[in-house]
Structure formats: C-alpha cells, structure tokens
Amino acid sequence: MQKQTLLNIGFGNFVVSSRVITIVNPSSSPMRRLREDARQEGRLVDATQGRKTRSIIVTDSNHVILSAIQAETIGHRYTSEEVEND
C-alpha cells in the first residue's frame, strides 16, 4: 500500500498530495468562474480562514479548494514532498 503524503495548504489544513491536479493563481477571469461554478455546484472548499484567497487547488475529484497561501509556496511544498518520496 502506498503511503499518502499530506500537503499543507495553510492554517492547519491539508490535502492528500496525490489527489492534487493543479495549483493556480486565482486572479484571472477563468479562475473566478471556476470558483463560482464550484460554489454553485457544492464542490468548493474554503480553507482561507477568512483571509484573501491567494491560490486555488483543483483535485482529481473535481473539488476546488481555496487557500490563503501563495500558489508558488504550495507548489514548492508539493515538489519538495515528491522529491522526498522518491
């Protein structure tokens, strides 16, 4: 059985890293539409703790997760975990 690693997305919130499809910046219009569509369909998880959204994470289950941590920071955490697991 493969060990599942958790990706810290800030404020005590974690995502299983193998389920992450993409980590993107929320400032573009398509990302705003993605967020609104997910909210309307009940697929949105807000992990910002009331702070400004700085990254959007999309999972293989088509859930959209909002994080207050920069996309670059989460990306570095994601890649460093992958290197550790190899």
Swiss-Prot record:
InterPro entries for the chain: RemA-like
One Pfam family recorded for the sequence: RemA-like
Top-level taxon of origin: Bacteria
Family stated for the protein in its record: Belongs to the RemA family.
HAMAP family on file: RemA
Protein name: Putative regulatory protein Desal_2819
